[in-house]
Swiss-Prot record:
This is UPF0262 protein SPOA0072. Residues 1-21 are annotated as: Disordered. It holds the Pfam family UPF0262. The keyword Metal-binding does not apply. InterPro entries: UCP032146. HAMAP family: UPF0262 (MF_00678). Belongs to the UPF0262 family. The keyword Electron transport does not apply. Keywords: Plasmid.
Length: 161
């Protein structure tokens, strides 16, 4: 297993309302999948040495910005970066709307219609992960699957359930 990965992730959701059961389930699955397999590296910046991973990541929203607080396993500060939430707003909103449709569809619609909604949901999810990768460019290197799982967690934080 590579050292350039996330070994622990925490969401600072202390100022958020409790999540719905569906959102809590999405969160648990995303965290489990993320910790099982991910790729997360901090590129060298300027002339500073970058502490090697694995990393502990704390995700939070402060002053309308998404904050990645990254530490080594020994809890030594490795990096911190703040991303504007603006570029995420529409895709997060679209993702939650399609998820709501999906959760409702699962209860009442035939599999063929559920599959159509699920394909749209995956497409929006892919768009969100692409936006995240763009926003992290030069700050952190992540693969597509890691971006997808982190995007799910950003959605949980962004809308607070």
């Amino acid at each position: 297993m590579t050292m350039s990965r996330i070994s622990h992730i925490e969401l600072d959701d202390s100022n958020l309302p409790p999540p719905t059961p569906e959102i809590e389930q999405e969160r648990k699955v995303a965290i489990y999948d993320l910790l099982e397999e991910n790729s997360f590296a901090l590129p060298a910046r300027d002339d500073r040495a970058v502490p090697e991973g694995p990393y502990r990541v704390n995700l939070s929203i402060r002053d309308k910005r998404l904050v990645f607080d990254i530490q080594t396993e020994d809890e030594e500060k490795a990096a911190e970066f703040h991303l504007s939430l603006g570029p995420f707003r529409q895709v997060v909103k679209d993702y939650f709307q399609i998820c709501e449709s999906y959760f409702n569809a699962v209860k009442t619609l035939p599999p063929s219609q559920i599959e159509t909604i699920d394909m749209a949901r995956r497409g929006i999810h892919n768009e969100g992960s692409r936006v995240l990768q763009e926003r992290l460019d030069g700050k952190a290197e992540i693969d597509t699957d890691t971006a997808r799982r982190l995007f799910t967690l950003i959605c949980v934080l962004h809308f607070g359930g």
